[in-house]
A protein has these predicted regions:
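Catalytic core of Fe(II)/2-oxoglutarate
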Residues: 83-151
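Catalytic core of non-heme Fe(II) oxygenases with the double-stranded beta-helix
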Residues: 29-107, 148
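Signature of the catalytic double-stranded beta-helix
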Residues: 1-29, 46-47
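A structural signal for short, well-ordered beta-strand segments
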Residues: 24, 58-60, 135-139
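Short, low-complexity Ser/Thr-rich regulatory SLiMs
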Residues: 26, 62, 125-127
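A short beta-turn/loop motif at secondary-structure boundaries
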Residues: 15-16, 68, 127-129
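Residue-level detector of short, conserved catalytic/binding motifs and their immediate flanks
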Residues: 22, 54-56, 111, 133
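Pocket-edge structural micro-motifs
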Residues: 26-28, 75, 117, 137
């Protein structure tokens, strides 16, 4: 990422404590993630990372499942009225994306995906005994033109 953006990437901190560098996700047979978005500008207004604009999410696929586990990315970004369709625990009603076009990304080991986390997305069910394994993190520019990553 440093070479791509020609900037040094620094791990974001909160009260002088660093965020994790990345998150390892293991999705097993039957696992899925319903419609959601990940941008923390609205979710976490008191946190330093919520102040970073133009946030992006990076996902590196380490292992592909035999079947399933595709990432479905909808051509719809979050807006405040969508909060009426929010699930109390996590994510949104699938109706929030009704009528939206979408792209499907297969989780192919070795592929790196960078996306705008403000677009709604979901993970289709993994089928079979081979797990879907990925590493993910967020990154963004600060107002003083520095690049930060966190998870």
């Amino acid at each position: 990422m440093s070479q791509l953006f020609q900037k040094e990437i620094t791990t974001a901190t909160e009260d002088e404590m660093p965020y994790s560098h990345c998150m390892i996700r293991i999705h097993k047979n039957g696992d899925s993630v319903h419609v959601h978005r990940d941008n923390c500008n609205f979710e976490m207004p008191d946190y330093v990372v919520s102040k970073y604009q133009n946030q992006l999410s990076a996902i590196l696929y380490l292992q592909s499942p035999r079947t399933g586990g595709e990432l479905k990315i909808y051509d719809k970004q979050w807006s405040l009225p969508d909060e009426s369709q929010r699930h109390p625990e996590f994510g949104y009603s699938s109706s929030v994306t009704d009528g939206s076009n979408y792209a499907v990304v297969s989780p192919i080991a070795g592929n790196l995906l960078v996306l705008n986390p403000n677009f709604y997305h979901q993970i289709e069910p993994v089928l079979g005994t081979k797990h879907r394994i990925s590493i993910g993190f967020f990154f963004a520019e600060s107002t003083d033109d520095k690049l930060f990553k966190w998870s």
